[in-house]
Amino acid sequence: MRLLATALILTATSAWAATVPPREGPGENGSPAWFLQPSSTDPAGHTVVDAQGRITVHPHVAGDETFNGFRCTESTICQNRYGPSRLTLDRVQWKQTMGYTFEYPIRLPPGDGGPPAAGIDSKGNIWIYQRKAPGNPQLFKYSPDHKLILTVAESVIGHQDKPHGMAVDAQDNVWLCDINGSTVMKVSPDGKLLQTFGQKHHRGDWDEAKGQRLLWQPIAIAFAPNGDIYIGQGHGNESPNDVESDDPTNIMGAARVLQLDKNGTFIRQWFGHEAGQGKFDQIHGLAVDPKTGDIWIGDREQYRIQVHSGDGKFLKTILTRNLSSTLSFDNDGFPWMATGQDGQVLKLDRNGKVIGAIGNGMGIGHGQFIESAYFDFDKDGNIYVGDTSTGRVTKLVKPKK
C-alpha cells in the first residue's frame, strides 16, 4: 500500500512538472543558453542620468508629458486588453558569450525624455533622436569622440510628438519618424530641413492616384542599396481609434510598407491587415538585407519577423522568443534585433537563430535597458543603442580581436 501511494505521488509530481514550462534551457545548435527573468518597472522617460550612466527615476508629475499620446480603447487593432500586461511577463534572456562591454559616453541635455534612436553617419558622427516636452530640441549630433557638435532646434523640425525610428542615408542625411506627428522628415548633415513626407498631425493613407500623400503612424525607415526608401507604418497596439474614423483620407487602418525611390517618387506599398502568410499586425522594426535587398519587418507583438522581397513579395516568417522591436544589419551583413522590454540586443543568422546576445535584461542597472530600441553600428562594430524609457544611450563595445 505504501509503495502504491509513493508511486501515485511520483506520478502526480511528474505530471505536474510536465505542465510547468521550463525556466531555463541549455545552449544548443549554435545558440547560447537561455533563462527567464522578471520584468522591471518602466519609468517612461522620467529619469535623471549621471556621468556614469546611472539612472535615478523621479516621480511622474501630472501634466508633465514628454509626448502627446493617444489611447486605444475600441479598435480591434489595439493590444489585447484582456490578457496579461506585457510589463508583468517573465522575459527570455540569452546568456552573453560575445564579450561586449557597456559604456555611456554620450551626455544628453538635462531633463526628461528617452532617446529611442541612435544613428551613425559615414564620418562616425552619432545622431541621437530624443523624446522631449514641447519647447526643447530633440535631435543632436555628436562627434566620434562623443562631443556635442550640433543641436537641431525645434524651430527647424517642429515638435516631434512621439519619436521612434531614425536612419542615416548614404549621403549622411538623417531621416526622422514621428508616429503621432504623422511625418517623416529628411534633415541635412548640417541640420537643415530638406523634405517632409506626410502632413503634420494628419494621419491617413497614401493614395498616389489622388495625389494624397499621407502617412499612418510612420515608425521606422530603411534604405535599399540603390537608394530606394522604405517607410514602415503602423504602431498598431498603441493606435488611436482612427480605424473607425469618418475621415475619407484615412480608411485603411492597417500597418503597411511604403516604397519610394531615392527622389521620393512613389513605387508601391503593401499592407499587413489580412490573415495569412506574410501579414503583420504592426511594424516596429524595419531593415533591408544589404546582400539580398530583402525587407525584414519586426512584427513586435506577434513575436515574429516577416521577410519580403524588395518588391513586397512574401518570402518567409521567422518566429522569435523575444519582442522583435527593432532590426538592423551589421557591417558584415549579419541581422541583429533589439528586444525592447526584454532588454537585450541579439545577433541572428538569416534563419533567425540567436547566435549571440548583449544586455543584462530589463532594468535601469549597468548594461540593462527598459526598452532597447533603434540602434546602429560604427566602423569598428560597436553598437549605439537608444532606450525609449531612460535618458541614456548605451554603447556596446565590441571586444578587440
Locate predicted features.
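Bacterial N-terminal signal peptides
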Residues: 5-14
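Sequence-structural signature of mature extracellular/luminal beta-sheet repeat domains
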Residues: 18-401
